[in-house]
A protein has these predicted regions:
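Short hydrophobic beta-strand element within catalytic cores of glycosyltransferases
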Residues: 309-314
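Aromatic "clamp/platform" in nucleotide-sugar-dependent glycosyltransferases that forms part
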Residues: 292
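Nucleotide-activated donor-binding/catalytic signature segment of Leloir-type glycosyltransferases, i.e.
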Residues: 254-272
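A charged, aromatic-enriched C-terminal amphipathic alpha-helix characteristic of glycosyltransferases
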Residues: 336, 350-383
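Membrane-proximal helix-turn-helix segments that form the acceptor-binding/catalytic region
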Residues: 110-113, 117-121, 145-165
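Conserved acidic donor-binding segment of nucleotide-sugar-dependent glycosyltransferases
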Residues: 325-338, 346-352
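Short alpha-helical donor nucleotide-sugar binding micro-motif in glycosyltransferases
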Residues: 271-272, 279-284
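Conserved donor-binding/catalytic core segment of Leloir-type glycosyltransferases
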Residues: 166, 202-229, 242
Length: 398
């Protein structure tokens, strides 16, 4: 394949072997590039047993063995990040003149140094995608004073050597410039991976329930939900809480459920199938995500596709709030205090079917303008790259 039509996407995780917003985003990016006719390599760590899986629109290249990415506390492990960065450096050095462009995740931050050094003098264009940008205090809260300060310094250094940065919120764009980016970042229009086929919006299930779907880690603040639901039940007596996922904070969440006497109205299904997740999303009164930090907020989009409004919490690190239009597709609570969150949940309940219809209408508009395809097209325009001669489509792929 000619260099001009070969692109690499580099991230240490790949959906569906690991799940999360970044995994979905980078897989979809590779698929869109392949759909546009580019020859695409996905450089990742091994996350499967047996032979490397094959994909129709991109090629999976494992560049490291299986890695233990997170500690027991849900924090990214530095040894794993360094191991992947070393694998990325070696893979790009060996292929430095194969690729017209490399799109690499800026998290973990070591990826940026590995890719920049490996591609020096090659003529390959480098795009660094920043899922999130943290200030110093966030790094210290996440990793401790010493490690957090070092991580923040490394982040600033990586941003300074980034030739083209992409991000997915005005919050991240502002932080990139504040942390030393030397050119204007490319802010994506959105990360929707095409329209999803779901039933038209319907009334919330009876009895009503608030849904949380995600990892249980301190930054997600799942443990604030039981007290909020207990407060909301003063006005909505049959309200329930359904908490999906697991993680290091699960015991703290269960302890809060016990503290507020919520055992009879709280369910912990753990991880569920895609079909069950769709069913729960479709029937939820609201999807609540009290996270203090989000780089984009794909959960808003996924819930609104089902006509389900979203309850978020205002925080300086939560870019998901940029997607919320008050009384259209959700409510932003000013704090995590039970009274404030309960008020937001009651506002959603008061919005009834009208709010559910407007949430779906928001999604229908967004799916035409806020897609990963539009984001990829913006990257290609900014580089720019020669258009590949032959365009593949999903229908043409095996």
């Amino acid at each position: 394949m000619e260099r001009s039509s070969t692109v690499a996407v580099a991230y240490d995780c790949l959906f569906p072997f690991t799940t999360g917003g970044g995994e979905r985003q980078y897989r979809a990016t590779a698929e869109v590039l392949g759909d546009l006719g580019f020859d695409v390599d996905y450089l990742t760590s091994r996350q499967w047993d047996g032979e490397t899986p094959t994909e129709g629109l991109f090629r999976i290249l494992p560049i490291t063995p299986r890695l233990s990415l997170y500690s027991a506390d849900g924090v990214r492990r530095i040894p794993a990040a360094l191991r992947y960065a070393a694998g990325l450096f070696g893979a790009l050095v060996r292929r430095r003149r194969r690729y017209a462009a490399v799109i690499v995740s800026g998290l973990p931050i070591f990826n940026v140094f590995a890719a920049r050094l490996a591609l020096l003098g090659s003529g390959t264009k480098l795009v660094v995608d920043y899922l999130e940008v943290w200030h110093r205090r966030q790094w210290i809260e996440y990793s401790g004073t010493v490690t957090g300060t070092i991580a923040w310094v490394l982040q600033r250094a990586a941003i300074a050597i980034t030739p083209l940065a992409t991000c997915h919120s005005q919050l991240s764009a502002t932080r990139l410039l504040r942390e030393g980016l030397r050119c204007e970042p490319l802010v994506s229009p959105g990360l929707i991976d095409g329209a999803v086929e779901v039933a038209p919006p319907a009334s919330a299930a009876t009895p009503p329930y608030v849904l949380y779907a995600g990892r249980h880690i301190p930054d997600k603040r799942v443990d604030v939900l039981p007290a909020a639901i207990a407060a909301a039940r003063e006005n909505i007596p049959d309200l329930r809480l359904v908490i999906l996922g697991t993680g290091p904070s699960s015991e703290a969440v269960r302890a809060e459920v016990h503290r507020v006497g919520g055992e009879s109205w709280t369910d912990f299904p753990g991880f569920v199938s895609e079909s069950e997740l769709d069913r729960l999303l479709h029937g939820a009164l609201a999807l609540a995500n009290p996270s203090r930090r989000e780089g984009y907020g794909l959960v808003v989009v996924e819930a609104n596709a089902h006509g389900t409004p979203v309850v978020l919490v205002a925080d300086e690190g939560n870019a998901a709030t940029e997607l919320i239009e008050s009384d259209v597709n959700g409510v932003v609570s000013p704090t995590t205090r039970p009274a404030d969150l309960a008020r937001a949940i009651r506002d959603v309940a008061d919005g009834g079917d009208d709010l559910r219809r407007s949430s779906r209408a928001w999604y229908d508009t967004a799916v035409g303008t806020r897609t990963i395809r539009r984001t990829v097209e913006g990257i290609l325009s900014a580089l720019p790259l020669p258009s590949p001669a032959t365009v593949k489509t999903k229908e043409d792929s095996p």
